[in-house]
């Protein structure tokens, strides 16, 4: 078999559907051609390779490149002062209603140029890449005007031009009510549906549309309108749902065949059943749970029992999860949410790919998929979840290089 590169003498965690658990292959080989995997499996079953380069992994573990399926990586400014206020007793809702929160970041984002947004996001992206990230989802949602939302999405896309990483973008215009629409949330949703989404779609700047369905965000009826507008433009949807209360957002997301519903601390049985039936992935965000000192756990066992796919993400954002470590996210998910090692690792590979609609292309070590790899100096995969402040990444491969 002709190929560009071969990684031999490796232990693989393939996450392939046909293998149990995380798909372990003890004596494994991965081969790539033109950026795609052409073989991933046991050395004893591998064809004869004609390779330009063969790399001896010396028994190291190879997983798919890590995927962060929920971030707000592009934003202006900083919210460290709000962190101090929260430590002094202020709640997320109190800070938001006092003009802080998302709106304060909106002002800084509007004031920044596209280039400035790219420059400020790069250190955050680099921190994730340093831990084996190869694909990231990035939302807009801090511009909250047509021009500034477009600027934010362009900045997110531009990150893929300056780093070897795949970026998927999500339009989150329905994130918060901008000051110019104070007292008129329906008027703002009109703007999102009739001006913003058509413009975003026309420029091809978004791979999906998201909304914040919450008491301090937008109602279920308003979210439905956003989803209908997205559907008319052929864009899949995602939803911030049931984080602070239960507005039946997850069930609404499932009704529209959403890729994912995210947060879910207040999710109920009806929402779980709807997600399971629709095949909507649950994206769990332990960093936000930790940072805002939430006490209500997402219903992990009920989601697990219903067969809802479980993905994990950093939720990197300036206000409620300034987290740029997927490895720490793994430990938080295991420690706080009682997820298993296998669930955690699948949550940042296979299930994360599912959550962004890219499972046909990334997320597992299988022939035909992008050759995105993370190569680790570990004895067993559990060490990626168990250790904190520990980065055993040996090498990262993106599209075969």
UniProtKB/Swiss-Prot annotation:
For binding 4-imidazolone-5-propanoate, which residues are annotated in this chain's numbering?
79, 142, 175, 243, 320
Chain positions recorded as Fe(3+) binding sites? 70, 72, 240, 315
Q: Name one GO biological process term.
A: L-histidine catabolic process to glutamate and formate
In the record's cofactor note, how is the cofactor described as bound? Answer: Binds 1 zinc or iron ion per subunit.
Cofactors (names): Zn(2+); Fe(3+)
Q: What is its main location?
A: cytoplasm
Q: Which residues bind Zn(2+)?
A: 70, 72, 240, 315
- Identify the metabolic or biological route this protein is part of: Amino-acid degradation; L-histidine degradation into L-glutamate; N-formimidoyl-L-glutamate from L-histidine: step 3/3
InterPro entries of this UniProt entry? Amidohydro-rel, HutI, Metal-dep_hydrolase_composite, Metal_Hydrolase
Keyword NADP appears in the UniProt entry: no
UniProt keyword annotations, A-Z: Cytoplasm, Histidine metabolism, Hydrolase, Iron, Metal-binding, Zinc
Task: Please list every transmembrane segment annotated in the UniProt record, as residue ranges.
Answer: none
Enzyme Commission number(s) of this protein: 3.5.2.7
Question: Which GO CC terms are listed, alphabetically?
Answer: cytoplasm
> Residues of the signal sequence?
none
Residues binding N-formimidoyl-L-glutamate = 142, 317, 319
The reaction(s) annotated as catalysed by this protein in its Swiss-Prot or TrEMBL entry are: 4-imidazolone-5-propanoate + H2O = N-formimidoyl-L-glutamate
The terms under GO molecular function for this entry are: imidazolonepropionase activity; iron ion binding; zinc ion binding
Q: Where in or outside the cell?
A: Cytoplasm
Top-rank taxon: Bacteria
Instruction: Quote the function comment for this protein.
Output: Catalyzes the hydrolytic cleavage of the carbon-nitrogen bond in imidazolone-5-propanoate to yield N-formimidoyl-L-glutamate. It is the third step in the universal histidine degradation pathway.
Stored NCBIfam families = hutI
Protein family according to the UniProt entry: Belongs to the metallo-dependent hydrolases superfamily. HutI family.
- This chain's protein is named Imidazolonepropionase
